[in-house]
């Protein structure tokens, strides 16, 4: 009797690393550029521990646009992130994963790139500030190959110290390239 078994590569082993690129919509989740339009983009390094849990360290840019008299003015946040993601669901072949992450964030917020005077003579009262806080993330990942992982995530950021709101909801997609 001949048995043919399929070999699967080992995935999510302790010490494995990946570089991930993410992006998506923020806050109002509008596709159209206009008042309330927000987006984010980030790059991070993931390092796996036991049970497919992983550490994430990276940077992110978030921009939300506010309308005033037919013009759009950006509020931008540059943040660094350090967090831990707990894998709570995966299939037997280790192709699909679901993880819940908690991260610390710190960075800088700028409103209209530091320009407080608007073209009509009005003055912005919001200022540039250092910001700090955290994020709760739900991440779904699927291995396309042994080295390429597709990501879908939703997260809630809570940031203090800024003038443009404490809560920011994000929905995004990404790709992780396993490098080691």
Give residue spans per PLM region.
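Residues that define the transmembrane beta-barrel architecture of outer-membrane proteins
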Residues: 15-17, 33-41, 72-80, 96, ...
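Extracellular loop and loop/strand-boundary signature of outer-membrane beta-barrel proteins
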Residues: 28-31, 66-73, 120-126, 158-162
């Amino acid at each position: 009797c001949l048995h043919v078994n399929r070999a699967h590569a080992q995935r999510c082993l302790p010490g494995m690393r990946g570089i991930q690129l993410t992006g998506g919509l923020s806050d109002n989740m509008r596709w159209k550029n206009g008042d309330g339009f927000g987006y984010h983009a980030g790059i991070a390094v993931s390092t796996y521990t036991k049970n497919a849990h992983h550490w994430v360290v990276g940077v992110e840019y978030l921009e939300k646009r506010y309308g005033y008299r037919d013009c759009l003015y950006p509020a931008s946040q540059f943040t660094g992130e350090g967090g831990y993601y707990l894998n709570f669901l995966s299939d037997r072949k280790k192709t699909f994963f679901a993880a819940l992450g908690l991260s610390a964030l710190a960075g800088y917020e700028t409103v209209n790139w530091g320009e407080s005077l608007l073209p009509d003579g009005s003055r912005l009262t919001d200022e540039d500030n250092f910001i700090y806080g955290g994020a709760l993330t739900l991440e779904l990942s699927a291995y396309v190959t042994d080295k390429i992982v597709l990501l879908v995530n939703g997260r809630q950021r809570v940031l203090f110290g800024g003038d443009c709101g404490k809560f920011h909801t994000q929905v995004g997609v990404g790709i992780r390239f396993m490098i080691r």
